[in-house]
Amino acid sequence: MSRLSAAVVAIDGPAGTGKSSVSRRLARELGARFLDTGAMYRIVTLAVLRAGADPSDIAAVETIASTVQMSLGYDPDGDSCYLAGEDVSVEIRGDAVTRAVSAVSSVPAVRTRLVELQRTMAEGPGSIVVEGRDIGTVVFPDAPVKIFLTASAETRARRRNAQNVAAGLADDYDGVLADVRRRDHLDSTRAVSPLQAAGDAVIVDTSDMTEAEVVAHLLELVTRRSEAVR
């Protein structure tokens, strides 16, 4: 049974803040559903790459995005992402998609379609934790609970590099740091839905916090806010 009365918990922030893992754990603690909107942009990006299109070709990206068929699970303990019925949960996390997703997600038509889909997917019984980059500012600007996670670029690069090494990839902190800074620039300067905290969001710097500490802090924030809106 859900411990949350507020319908939507919006969690935004750049990559490497622990956003995805924290959001999943928070949803589990709250007994809420979970929606990873970043995975949706990755699915569209994978569709673009599979079609052999250039991610910077706006017309081609728009055409592909308008017809792409996707579905995602709501279980915070799972990672079910499907493209045209095929499980692509692992493939969308690959380097090729990671390098191209910023270009694809900056296309206005892509964001328009996915925002509509995100709002539809969030409907249903119970509460939902939605994580992304424009949830509190664009997708659910009226969400009763808005949280923006942040951390220094260096901290986020260390975390991402450690994940790569643990997964058997090369130890390349400098390369990861450069990619983090590049992604930050692209996300914060794009014309449509730039990455920024909502004016009424609670900003949490996770640089010196463990994942468990962040989850405990957010659980307290969400519970307190939920009680306030009852």
Swiss-Prot record:
InterPro entries: Cytidylate_kin, Cytidylate_kinase_dom, P-loop_NTPase
Catalytic activity of the protein: CMP + ATP = CDP + ADP; dCMP + ATP = dCDP + ADP
Family in the record: Belongs to the cytidylate kinase family. Type 1 subfamily.
Keywords: ATP-binding, Cytoplasm, Kinase, Nucleotide-binding, Transferase
Stated name of the protein: Cytidylate kinase
GO molecular function: (d)CMP kinase activity; ATP binding; CMP kinase activity; dCMP kinase activity
Organism: Mycobacterium tuberculosis (strain ATCC 25618 / H37Rv)
A single GO cellular-component term on record: cytosol
Quaternary structure (record): Monomer.
An individual GO BP term: nucleobase-containing small molecule interconversion
Gene that encodes the chain: cmk
Main EC class the enzyme belongs to: transferase
Binding site for ATP: 13-21
Annotated compartments: Cytoplasm
A UniProt-annotated Pfam family: Cytidylate_kin
E.C. no: 2.7.4.25
